[in-house]
């Protein structure tokens, strides 16, 4: 929502399995996960926690069994900070911190609503990824879009991805309708946030984590494309985004 197979990894060694010959060597396994977190943060160019130091993040009680979390906390206005977290054998560890992101032009709001230009607070699933660019890899389903891809804000298809020629679409594709064409620069890469999964009209549609154009969004979370690609490569099914002021 702009203003107007081998497991791929975000950072090498982030996901590590115990060496088969040393399955009971818990110390070695924890060491490797910790090293992976530090290496990941270095590659991203951001700060990380000391090796092996588990922390208690603000969202811990709200994300259930999730092991990957994108934490987005407001820094005022339409800007926020994203931290990338992984739950390991010793608890939660940040694998990337202090990533600057843009949120809604009106900041954040307790609940999503069409047209309020605010990013909804809460915890949301990260359902699948899409973009105008080829699939960068990762654990999420990825859809490469063309000019025939839309996110509908109308009728029975409200808050769903649709594929149709503009002249053949059964929903209003005009910008005034709220429907979005998904073949635009801000959607070079994007991740679908599970906002309003019940698809109740008026309760919000088309909330994504997507490539930034350098300005505030209509309610999405936007960041630089290089970092977003790394995140997409790292994400696995079950990951969530947690948003707060």
Please place each PLM-identified region on the residue numbering.
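Secretory targeting and sorting signals
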Residues: 15, 20, 24-54
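Charge-dense polyanion-binding interfaces
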Residues: 242-245
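Low-complexity, intrinsically disordered or signal/transmembrane-proximal segments
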Residues: 4-5, 15
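Conserved "landmark" site that anchors the functional core of diverse proteins
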Residues: 224
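Short cysteine clusters
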Residues: 220
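Cell wall/extracellular polymer interaction/catalysis modules
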Residues: 55-217, 228-240
């Amino acid at each position: 929502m702009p203003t107007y197979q081998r497991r791929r990894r975000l950072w090498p060694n982030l996901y590590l399995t115990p060496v088969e010959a040393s399955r009971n060597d818990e110390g070695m396994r924890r060491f490797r996960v910790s090293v992976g977190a530090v290496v990941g943060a270095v590659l991203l160019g951001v700060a990380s926690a000391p090796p092996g130091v588990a922390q208690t993040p603000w969202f811990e009680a709200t994300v259930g069994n999730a092991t990957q979390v994108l934490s987005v906390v407001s820094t005022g206005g339409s800007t926020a900070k994203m931290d990338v977290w992984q739950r390991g054998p010793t608890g939660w560890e940040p694998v990337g911190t202090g990533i600057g992101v843009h949120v809604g032009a009106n900041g954040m709001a307790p609940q999503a609503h069409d047209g309020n230009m605010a990013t909804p607070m809460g915890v949301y699933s990260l359902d699948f990824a899409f973009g105008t660019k080829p699939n960068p890899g990762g654990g999420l389903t990825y859809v490469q879009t063309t000019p025939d891809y839309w996110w509908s804000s109308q009728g029975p298809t409200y808050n769903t991805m649709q594929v149709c020629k503009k002249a053949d679409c059964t929903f209003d594709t005009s910008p005034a309708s709220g429907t979005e064409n998904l073949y635009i620069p801000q959607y070079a890469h994007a991740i679908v946030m599970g906002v309003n999964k019940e698809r109740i009209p008026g309760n919000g549609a088309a909330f994504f984590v997507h490539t930034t154009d350098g300005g505030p969004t209509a309610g999405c979370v936007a960041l630089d494309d290089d970092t977003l690609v790394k995140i997409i490569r790292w994400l696995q099914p079950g990951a969530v985004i947690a948003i707060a002021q």
